[in-house]
From Swiss-Prot:
It comes from Eptatretus burgeri (Inshore hagfish). It is found in: Secreted. Keywords: Complement pathway, Disulfide bond, Glycoprotein, Immunity, Inflammatory response, Innate immunity, Secreted, Thioester bond. GO terms for cellular component: extracellular space. Residues 1479-1616 form the NTR domain. This is Complement C3. CDD domains: ANATO, complement_C3_C4_C5, NTR_complement_C345C.
Amino acid sequence: VLVIAPAATSSYDDLAVAILMVDQKKITEVHVLLVNPHTGATLDEKKVKLQWDNKFIAFTKLQVTPKEVEKWKEDFVRLMVKWDGGQHMEIDIPLTSRRGLVFAQTDQPIYTPNNDVNIRLFPVTRQLNPILSSLVVDIMNPDGVVVDRIEKNAFEVEKVMELRPFHVPAITSLGDWKIVSWMKDKPQFNYTSGFKVEEYVLPTFDVSITSEQPYLHVYDKAFTIHIKAMHIYGKPVMGRAYVRYGVKHQSKRTLLSTSSALARFEQGEAMHTLRQKHILEQYPDPKLLLGQSLYVEASVISSDAGEIENSILDDIPIVASPYSIKSKWTVPFFKPGVPYIYKVLVLNPDGSPASGVPIKVSFSFDSSGNWITQKRKTMDNGIAMQTINTARNSKKLNIKVQTEDERLEQSQQAEASFTIASYSSPSGSFIHLNAHREVKSPGEHIVFDVFIKSAAKDHVLHFNYLMISNGKIHNFLQEGRKGDTTSVSLLLTPELVPQFRLVAFFILPSGELVADSIIIDVKDSCHAKLSLDVAGGKRLFSPRDNVNFDLSGESDSWVAVGVVDKAAYVLDKKNKLTANKVYKAMEASDLGCSVGSGKTGPLVFRDAGLAIMAKEISGMDDVKDPGCPNGHTRRKRELVLEIAIEKASTYPAELRKCCRDAAIESPLRLSCEERTKHIHDEGEGCQETFLECCKHVEEELLIAMEEEDEDLGRSQGEDFMIQESQVVIRSHFPESFMWEIIKLSRSAENGKSRITKKMPDSITTWDIQAVEVSQSKGLCVGPSLELTVFKQFFLKVHTPYALKQYEQVELRVVIYNYMNQDVKGEIQVKCGDGICTDAEQNEPLKSRFAVEKNSATSFSFMVVPLSSSDSSVSVLARVFGSDVHDAVEKDLRVMPEGNYEEMSRSWSVQPRRHGGQQVIVVDNETPQNVVPGTEMSAFLSAQGNLVAETIQNTLKGSKISNLLRLPRGCGEQNMMYTSITVMVARYLNRSDQWNKMGDPQLKKRSFDFITSGFASQLTYRKPDYSYAAWLHRASSTWLTAFVAKVFSQARQLVFIPVSEICGSVRWLMRKQDKDGSFLESKPVVHLNMMGQVTGKVVLTSFVFIALLEARESCINEVEGFTVVVEKAHGYLTSQAMNGLEDFPLAITAYALSLWKVSDGAAKVTMHTLKTSGLQTEELIHWGSNKGKAAAVESTAYGLLAAIQHEEGEIAEKATNWLSQSATFGGYFQSTQDTVMALQALTGFESCQSRMKKMDLSFKIRAEENGVFDKEFQITNDNAFVQKPFKVPVHGQLTVTASGTGQGILTFVKKYREKVVIKKDCKGFSLEITTNLDNQVKQRRRQSINPEFNVYRFIGCFRYLRNQEPGMVVMDISLPTGFEAKKKDLDDMKNLVDNYIVQYEIRPGRVFLYLDKVNKDEKNCVGFRLNQVFESNLVLPVTATVFEYYEPDFRCSKSYHPKMEVNPDASCHGNICNCLQRHCVELKGMADEDRNADRNGNACRAEYVFIIGVTKVTKTASYININAALKTVLKKGMDQAINVGARRSFVIPMHCGKNLNVSPGDIYLVMGMHNAHWRNSDRTQYVLTSDTWFEKFPLESVCRLPSPPASCQVSENFKGCSLKG
């Protein structure tokens, strides 16, 4: 009996067994069993009968269940056969618990930070049938660190699993992220896909660079490239390319300085050639370039729109010999006397196939020395085939291959030698398979020829055939022999996709097994039917067309659909789920050792991935153990299991599992050494075996992968245009849509469904993909369907990120005409309210255009926002004489002038301390320099929990960055944001108060935010688990401790690998000094807070606290942990008695109290702390001599220490002080004080009784414009969720609180502050200059964009404080229409003379970080400002320098690009008219003709004054008129006004050009109350177009003997006849 089975199997697959009776003389019953090798118990069994009816062959399947396998520890199952009473055979089949595959799909291939990634998973068997399995998914950043873990439980109805979205953090690692998924019950087998994270905008067109050869020979005279630029919608780009070449060595790039050139496009294509002279000028000896690479950059500028897209062709090898020769596709054995087809693969240096290369093939047999030479050329796939007629008695075939490229010298040609052995047969018999080359599809027949050579061939009446695919035998059949050559036709079934091995064999009467095998490719196709198409087959649509998608698939299947803008795939397409990826994964299940044949008949089976056993057949000793021999690399990509099985066989049985498990990849990506430390109870020798096998697998897999990487109109006049009412405006431009799963039920007609979708407005090509999962037919990834949304005539509107009020900015429209005729027409621009254009009043802006066919033109227009409200622009272009048109609407974001500011104050509310009723008076004055016309708001917020405001704003989306107004660009800043959320989430968890927050999803979102923060922080982690403010700087002990502390706290809430925490702990332990203190090599914290002498105490306390927080996670993971902690405690104890300053004292007191409250040093330190604080009856705080931020942090540590020591009175007083120090929203001055204050306050709240009585009543009263009254109550139920009340922005507020409990009252006023020429500076001086950069301007005009200027910004500051500075930040606002040149910022950061350590670009702003500041001289930064939009009337903007940890120390200055424009020509035409329409009009000298109008206005106006001008000043944007009131005829809302009072009247700068107001002038001013704002006695009035502004004569003039008529007018004017 001959038994054939796969060389390995899975506990989740059936085991197919083929059985043949060698001696076909009698009917025999064969009993086939699967046996537990440990107990001998039968797992499954079948009985088959071999007889004449079935040609004495049988094919059966057995199954072993995963639950049974889990009961024993062996890595194999025993296959046993019994027949004829007592005869039996058995063989051990290696067993894997691999269950199947998991494929992942994302809704886009690339994302920007702060976006959501939608993920689908498709868990299937190796045969692609759906699996019901719970899954675990790790999201891994580019550094290989798991930043989020998502678990998804299986449900019967879900064949496609959609995960919750993964939120990419706002600050994170850019690059390639991984999605690592595995089935929950099989964590040892994981599957990887991915997505990319970059800061990008979708390209408007695709630029690709190709070279005529994929390498540069070191002596090449020329190197030619081809550049292709195509719009995403398929049309060629017209324009030019700026081409640059350079040399890359490792990561360093060197530009070939004389190689830059312009290349012009024709029909979207351009060509350029690099000449050898350009290289020799910089590298006279080309041989020095060997081993380096060439790169090519191309910036393509479209001539129509001026848009720029870039591309790079990278890593072009510079070589002396450009080719390599491989023979991996060659069958390793030949049959003597049968033509042998030798395949050679020639590769380029980049691994791509080298086509058209002449080669010389020489061969000889045995040791004859007689070489026969033939010449060939490689095909497109790099393969050249040579047929060699072999000699009948040859044992060895020698082959030499050499390239014959005529461009190369002989020494530069590639060559290789190979030896092919003959098939070995004792009788000289063999069988040879030859398949017809055409690749067939499932359902078709494959035809192949079988050739036999044997002296005993008359005894061979039939051949036996096995078809093996994906590690399984799919068919076993027998066909009769028809002479020396037999043609056989076999039906291809879907199970054989993508390829199968065909084994043919016969058995001679002598017992010799003769066999051959080949690999046959099957055309990739799905078993399941899936079709997604558009009804009618249409591929071209217009925006907003309804598209009917016809979906056809299997009944009861699930189809996942997604649509992506093809522009996204221009940026990254490697992670797209394709059918090819699925089939490649299936190929990995192949168990074969070679591409076919074998040394002997039995070895043919082994090399085909089969295990065989037979008693009657000779040569079986070679195959008694299944699997490939040493030295043979399998074609599959997943080789780990086989390597481990082979290695495990060299160990005793009790250690084989230790070795085998080493092959299973750790989900946490731990090293072999780290994994070994987790082995504890597996017996003696297991750790050593595991480590040795783990390293062996890594080395062998690396070798194997290296080998595998060798693979490869007509015109009807201008009187007709489409009516505007018929126009559809395009305004919806998503990157992806239609992320849906569609169920095809049995009730659907033949598995069909029609889906109707409206296409978005984008002019682009959409890539539409459908993936089907059928219960019966498995997974099918359908081909992409591309639909182009296009108009032959369309617009593209270019707008800046934001406009600023009163600034004049150019907007540009590009008109594309892809029709086959030139067109003329009209373009019409309408802007929303509050936008001035060059149009007539209440009319759209119109202009005519002419565009040639297949061309484009641009149209520009100026806009000026008059208000700070967002608006929109709508552009319509219509062609004369036709209905051809397009319209686009875009939002215009308008930012008010000035900077956002807020002022706030908090009060502790404790009525019981005030006799049961507490009265709080809130000053509500308007700050100086408020921008006129901007909204101002004031709020009062009262809550019954000291940290409620912080919790609300942290967890409910009120952005911390806005409240704190600090940048976040380094590792410490990022941790601050994460740690705040950790603090409040821990508090709500401990106090079980999530249900009181009023949002059931809040807990989940909070945990997601923490996970996202963890991911962001890993951006700053080094390989040794230490952290630095920036990766290129030295690691910081303090920051690493901060991270370890927060991660330890966060681990109680979300998944964070212990290895991350303990890795940092190990690094910290190495920073401990002999005396127990800790050393800091790169300070991050504010040095002033640490003190000159006590800095070591502060740092040691901080690290000590972090280690205690991490104790639970690391005490058993980190060797020596306890010793280090005890040494640190000893050091702090010795220093506690040394008269520490407030901050070191407070942090030391808290650190010692964490160790043990009863400790003597802890008690003494706490006593000292109590007596040193600044106390009142209700408050206590520490550290005020070091600034507000230091005082907050010191008091926070003092409060934490008091809580530990149960010092209730001290804790309550410290809590009161901290509560009153918070800003609106619950935040403080900077990062660390906010973090520690919040930890302390939540700690205080946590230790209060959960059942404490809360019943506070509040009454708010304001007397302004009548009476404002508001009453509300706070109880335990709403202590967290009380919202702020909006209160009047003017006038004193009185708040009366009564009842029981303790709360906090916060007042905040928000407003826009004018940019002033000079502001008060504290701790810094600052100088700003901006000048036109003529040299840069000239270069830009030669290359990229000639229209706009370039300016150079220089900012210099001096540090004026008498102490060492900490980190300094420069916050630089950019003028509208300008952007910072990124290369200059990179140079400031990266060059050896670096000025900054990091920068951060935000819309309209740049943050620069300096950690090296010279106290004794100026510190300067500088970069170029590129003008990207034309702007006139540009307003000044502000640059500010401040200390990061003490932001009160700052200096701000305004600056302005020195524009080359005439100030008198800053506006023109109707823009000026539009601006003036909103301006106050000076009526001139009083005149009797205006009497009626004057009196009518006096009756309508709410205030009527006659003023005398005392002073006129100008700011950046306004004229301020200070005046004394000479007559008050109507007071309006300003009831406190009287004659002689002083008031200010404000006019926008662009309105004051022709007013000529001077001190001493007298004016009549009448207007409405909504145009003024007040600040105590400094009420200011904004003069607008609704204001009556008339000049009155001077009193001295009216006393003249003959006064002018205007004097009579002024004397007679008494206002409205109705008294005001």
